[in-house]
Amino acid sequence: KLVGGKYVITRKWQKQPFENGWRYGNGDALAVLKPANFIELWRLLKICITQDFIVIMQAANTGLTGGSTPYGNDYDRPIVIINTLRINDIQLINDAKQIIAHAGSTLYDLENKLKPFDREPHSVIGSTSIGASIVGGVCNNSGGSLVKRGPAYTELALYARLNKQGKLELVNELGINLGKTPETILNNLQNGNYNNEDIIHNEKLASDNEYSKIVRGIDENTPARYNSDKRLLYGASGSSGKVVVFALRLDTYPKAKKNKVFYLGTNNPDVFWKIRRDMLSKFDNLPTLGDYLHRDCYDAAKKYSKDNFIVIEKLGTNFLPTLFELKRSIDIVASKVKFLPDKLSDR
């Protein structure tokens, strides 16, 4: 009754796209729930906590490192997956210099929303084109190839958590005056019931402002990036599913007037070692991003990514999220039909 029968998925074959990870991770869930707004999400959480269910939050489920699906079938309690893709609004504030990203909003939609303002999101990596969510990236400090901007990070968020007494509570660290009670706060944010005077400007960060300095420390003993870096664990940032994120406040960036992509190849990895050190220590402007690609990856892309190439060339990137969703559905069906090969879409 709360979300409507259409958005409570219990049939096994209908649950599979939500129970299976992009690269790995799968397991059985009691149900998949798809709330349409913050109030529905909040009330679902209260029911799940009362019933002592395990809650796995999920948005686009495009992650390559797992976490958005069950992992095996040896959990001690029933699992409920809450998929947030219907809660996908993005609100622009401070002349589009910042955004409020709702739980299921995607980098792809944000990129398009910022275009008229000549600005772009923090993340401009490949997952943008396949529908990756904004919140998922921040919860995992994603953006490993982003040299200039570094990890996805903010100290401004609205999220739910269990307190020490095991009670569900809503934490408003968004820096916007939205009211006192949980449902008032959620309803006001959902409907944009706030004005510029309600937006608080303080020292809390909406992006990682130190990474460009850290990454230049080429002679330091510690790496510029590593898992569970305490510097990047704050509220929703780096939470990895331990809290339920309703919304994030994030910085946006001026769009570069000129961009150029360089592809460099070598049989000697020491060449790249020297290039990396020279770029980080001597360049006035850091590259937006950089990636290493092994020859095997190149060969695999050449063999298996012709469909992507054709779609981008003929239709542009707009169709890519739909293509990847179709690909996933085909592979799930093929895995259940004995005479069809696994990963049928790649053949």
Task: Specify the residue positions occupied by each region the protein language model found.
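A common structural junction motif
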Residues: V3, T50-F53, D118-P121, L280-L289
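General beta-strand structural signal in soluble alpha/beta enzymes
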Residues: Y7-K12, K34-P35, V55-A59, G66, ...
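C-terminal substrate-recognition/cap domain of FAD-linked oxidoreductases
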Residues: R249-P254, K260-R347
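Anion-binding (especially nucleotide phosphate/pyrophosphate-binding) glycine-rich loop
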Residues: G72-I87, L92-I134
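FAD-binding subdomain of flavoenzyme oxidoreductases
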Residues: F117-R119, S123-V271
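N-terminal flexible segment immediately upstream of the FAD-binding catalytic core
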Residues: K1-T50, T62-I100, L250, C297-Y304
